């Protein structure tokens, strides 16, 4: 496993900048509503999906959007669609397992098809909305790029089926068609 090392001068500069930023009233990471972390998956032995979550800069009741990247195996966390934050709460997920910072210690947790990936993402969303219950009632959109065109309809179907069967927290899914998902990604981001 590769580790990153930083020089002492670099770390001092970061600490000084952080202190100056808070001294002069610049927003902190907490103020900006940014969260990152892992959720474990109940259908796995040891898998953890990593995510970044950015709260809307406009209104906490703005829609929740999950951004999926393609590849397969491309991390969603390298995307920087800041304009989305003006109109939505945005989730990036490193998926499938062993992409980006997501990991598993058991090879049986690796996924090789859209159904398995969509089950993992559904479990992720259940954990996410359990941690953020105030967002569960908000409109929910699935979007992405490239190979995510395979995952988007699979996840939309999984969410729809989970809602119908009352398997957990009801997710207020607003898009169930891949063509509509593509259109959603281009709605006015101001």
Swiss-Prot record:
* Compartments in which it is found: Secreted
Keywords linked to the UniProt accession: Glycoprotein, Secreted, Signal
Please give a single GO biological process term from the UniProt record: proteolysis
Looking up Pfam families in the UniProt record yields: Peptidase_S10 (PF00450)
Indicate whether DNA-binding appears among the record's keywords: no
As one GO molecular function, the record gives: serine-type carboxypeptidase activity
User: A single GO CC term, please?
Assistant: extracellular region
Q: Which PANTHER family match?
A: SERINE CARBOXYPEPTIDASE-LIKE 48 (PTHR11802:SF259), SERINE PROTEASE FAMILY S10 SERINE CARBOXYPEPTIDASE (PTHR11802)
Can you name this protein?
Putative serine carboxypeptidase-like 54
Q: Which organism is it from?
A: Arabidopsis thaliana (Mouse-ear cress)
Upper taxonomic classification of the species? Eukaryota, Viridiplantae, Streptophyta, Embryophyta, Tracheophyta
Q: Which gene encodes it?
A: SCPL54
